[in-house]
Amino acid sequence: MKKVFSVEEIKEIESREFRKRGGDSFSLMVNAGVNCAKKIIKLVKKKPIIIVCGPGNNGGDGFIIGNYLHEKEYKVEVFCLQKKYYKGDALKAFKKLKIKTQNISKFKARKNSVIIDCIFGTGLNKPISGTLKSVILRMNKLNKIISIDIPSGINGDTGKILGCAVKAHTTLALHAKKIGHTLNPGKKFSRKIIVVDIGISKKFNYK
């Protein structure tokens, strides 16, 4: 069974799982968010949490994580884009969010908080610039950052930095490691990698 996958292979594995679920992709996002939140609880105990959400499904995972931690009585702040930038499952997760959000441009680093990086996942294919680059540079001033799936700004296939990248303390890889986790600088930026089971059948890992 393979243990490290390309971005395209992960997309195919997810597509097979969606078909098995009758096209229900949102339930997989919920699994990913909830299971990541459970890992976060084990890693950080009761520290304040700041979740930074980008425009895609990685941001959607962040909204699910935020709700779960909020229900467990964690102090949670969510910084994200405006609603118009979300679609599909990410928009669905945004609408279900029970926490008041703040605009991502207003993000401020706080030394006593743990940052959850949900800005970009493995689907990023162009350099980060503008506001999101500024946010990442501010995030990197902190020691404790947990990235969801891959540090934002790291190419999932090459490990290269796309404009800038989050320097994670821990990376929660969804379902399996990606090639970008194993190649520098992606390997260095991912630091400690924990694979999180998100409910995808392991039989799809076989070619």
Could you describe each region identified by the protein language model?
Residues F5-E8, G23-N35, G60, G88, ...:
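Conserved active-site and cofactor/substrate-binding residues in soluble primary-metabolism enzymes
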Residues I10, C36, V76-V78, I116, ...:
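Hydrophobic aliphatic residue packing
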Residues K2-F5, N112-K207:
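YjeF_N-associated NAD(P)HX repair module
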Residues N31-V34, N57, I136-L137, K192-I193:
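Short, surface-exposed, charged/polar-biased interaction segments
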Residues M1-K46, S201-K207:
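Positively charged, low-complexity intrinsically disordered leader regions
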Residues S15, R19, V52, C80, ...:
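A near-ubiquitous, low-amplitude feature marking generic local secondary-structure context
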Residues K38-I119, P127-I148:
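Nucleotide and nucleotide-moiety/phosphate-recognizing core
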